[in-house]
């Protein structure tokens, strides 16, 4: 049965990195992958065309699709729009609309990039962490929220942090099942000493953990976890955490690898449908200059093949091809160092295709 993929180019470098990734997808389709794809706008591109960052056309296409591939959203030119109309709101809206509750962000350090990390090679060599972040709850979506005027005339901003038992249960299962395929360790991260939300989180993880006796469960406060990621990151296998803590920790973990331009991500629903995107932003400063690193987006396609199309063989083919071009010494500007060859976005795409 043909799988349908919605492709959202987005803003900034989004169209460039997506173009290189689609070339890989086209090659697989030509070789017999039973899939097709259609483009739709999201973010600033969608606002320009439809007046909304997540328009009805895009909603309908994404709801019908088996998987969604996204470039990046956001650009300073939209900063003065009302908050609900800004490009980033399109990303929040699609996650909520498709009920993409589980965000998987690998932080893997390729041996060829060991010197690109800001940490000493002996601390990060062989790093392979997976951060499992809950995406649709927590303080980003909690109500009530807003800015109000107090009786004394002072303005006050307020937000609501909350998690239901069912929300925690389903993300816990994703974390434990992910760990079973890896090194069988889950570290649950929160702030249970001061936040009731994460106190409940810890209790539920303890309960669910009993269903996975082969997986070792530990707990860590988020401030300590942030420190340990820099001090001794290889102690971690799967880190499971809520929306706001996961947002921060996954960006921190990404820099252990030397470049956020290397890191893919998957956001999944309960049935394996997913949104796949690079972990980096839209980099408007280099947009349209053929300088962007397409590898995180190409690796996001590998995750799409693995999780939504159940095609492990092609997923590994993509990952092996990326490793091969790194072994050949090819580098975009973000991962370039002396002794390697600086290439453009499209040249990196050429190299991955050749390696396939």
Curated annotation (Swiss-Prot):
Enzyme class of the recorded protein, top EC level: oxidoreductase
Alphabetical list of Pfam families matching this protein: Iso_dh
Residue positions binding substrate: 95, 105, 133, 223
Site positions (Important for catalysis): 140, 191
Protein name: 3-isopropylmalate dehydrogenase
Family: Belongs to the isocitrate and isopropylmalate dehydrogenases family. LeuB type 1 subfamily.
Residues holding Mg(2+): 223, 247, 251
Subunit structure: Homodimer.
PROSITE patterns given in the database record: IDH_IMDH
Binding site for NAD(+): 281-293
Source species of the chain: Neisseria gonorrhoeae (strain ATCC 700825 / FA 1090)
Record-linked InterPro entries: IsoCit/isopropylmalate_DH_CS, IsoPropMal-DH-like_dom, Isopropylmalate_DH
Reaction it catalyzes: (2R,3S)-3-isopropylmalate + NAD(+) = 4-methyl-2-oxopentanoate + CO2 + NADH
Gene expressing this chain: leuB
NCBIfam families the record matches: leuB (TIGR00169)
One Gene Ontology biological process: L-leucine biosynthetic process
Entry EC number(s): 1.1.1.85
An example Gene Ontology molecular-function term: NAD binding
Listed GO CC annotations: cytosol
């Amino acid at each position: 049965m043909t799988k349908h993929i919605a492709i959202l180019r987005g803003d900034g470098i989004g169209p460039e990195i997506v173009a290189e990734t689609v070339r890989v997808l086209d090659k697989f389709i030509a070789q017999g992958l039973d899939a097709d794809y259609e483009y739709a706008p999201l973010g600033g591109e969608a606002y320009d065309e439809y007046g909304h960052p997540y328009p009805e056309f895009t909603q309908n296409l994404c709801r019908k699709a088996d998987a969604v591939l996204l470039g990046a959203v956001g650009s300073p030119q939209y900063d003065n729009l009302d908050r609900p109309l800004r490009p980033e709101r399109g990303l929040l809206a699609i996650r909520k609309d498709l009920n993409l509750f589980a965000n998987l962000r690998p932080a893997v350090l390729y041996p060829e990039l060991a010197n690109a990390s800001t940490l000493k090679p002996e601390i990060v060599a062989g790093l392979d962490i997976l951060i499992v972040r809950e995406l649709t709850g927590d303080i980003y979506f909690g109500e009530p929220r807003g800015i109000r005027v107090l009786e004394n005339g002072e303005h006050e901003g307020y937000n609501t942090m909350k998690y239901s038992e069912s929300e925690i249960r389903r993300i816990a299962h994703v974390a434990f099942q992910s760990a079973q395929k890896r090194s069988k360790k889950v570290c649950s991260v929160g702030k249970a000493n001061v936040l009731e939300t994460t106190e409940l989180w810890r209790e539920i993880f303890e309960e669910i953990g009993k269903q996975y006796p082969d997986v070792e469960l530990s707990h860590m406060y988020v401030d300590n976890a942030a420190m340990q990621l820099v001090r001794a990151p290889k102690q971690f296998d799967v880190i499971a955490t809520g929306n706001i803590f996961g947002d921060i920790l996954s960006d921190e973990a990404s820099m252990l690898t030397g470049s956020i331009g290397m890191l893919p991500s998957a956001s999944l629903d309960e049935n394996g449908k997913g949104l796949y995107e690079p972990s980096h932003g839209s980099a408007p400063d280099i947009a349209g200059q053929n300088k962007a690193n397409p590898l995180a987006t190409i690796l996001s396609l590998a995750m799409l093949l693995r999780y939504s199309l159940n095609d492990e063989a092609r997923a590994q083919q993509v990952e092996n091809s990326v490793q091969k071009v790194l072994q050949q010494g090819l580098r975009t500007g973000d991962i370039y160092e002396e002794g390697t060859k600086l290439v453009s976005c499209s040249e990196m795409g050429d190299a991955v295709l050749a390696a396939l």
